[in-house]
Amino acid sequence: MFSPAIDNLVAQLTRLPGVGTRTAHRLAFHLLRAPRDEALELASALQEAKERVRFCVDCGNWTEEETCEICRDARRDRSVICVVEQPADVLSLELTHEYRGLYHVLGGALSPLDGVDPEDLRIDELFRRVESDGVVEVVLATNPNTTGEATASFLADRLRHRVRVTRLASGLPVGGDLEYADEVTLGRALSGRREV
């Protein structure tokens, strides 16, 4: 419809989650109207993040160091690990200011239909941390959808004889993602977590 360069930009923007064709066009036109320096700064920031940000060797959260800021924080409660699917979930929970333990990012959820099995996730790393780090509680904070519930059930079955296993309380919408829940809802869910 437009020039090949604009069509390509729109196509690339639609690859972002939640960005449809109409939004991609708006973003593309905004970037084209913006001063050249502004567009180049955005491109540079994206490139820098892709080059510098990696996964924490301990928990799997995003970091620029070998170990993330949360894992390095001596004030955190090291006896509790909150298990989440993605690094974005860590941010969502941190914004509640209700949780002071550590995290473990699985990198997804079990989904046999999609070919995601336990060995495809950071589950063995979680078991090693529980065994060696003096963990007394694991909070299962996977998404309240089919794959998240299946993952929580799988982990609970394998952990409940070793440590206390809790699940976030209800209040989170079934079928929703933690990333989109507000701080109050997440805070209540954390405070009201239950044994599994």
Where are the predicted features?
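Extended, structured, electrostatic nucleic-acid-contact surfaces
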Residues: 1-17
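Long C-terminal interaction/binding lobes of large macromolecular proteins
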Residues: 2, 99-100, 127-196
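Extended interfacial segments that mediate partner engagement and assembly in macromolecular machines
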Residues: 24, 72-142
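Short metal-coordination and nucleic-acid-contact micro-motifs, chiefly zinc-binding Cys/His arrays
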Residues: 49-52, 64
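Short cysteine-rich clusters marking metal-coordination/redox-active sites
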Residues: 56-59, 68-71
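Short functional micro-motifs and their immediate structural scaffolds
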Residues: 63-65, 76
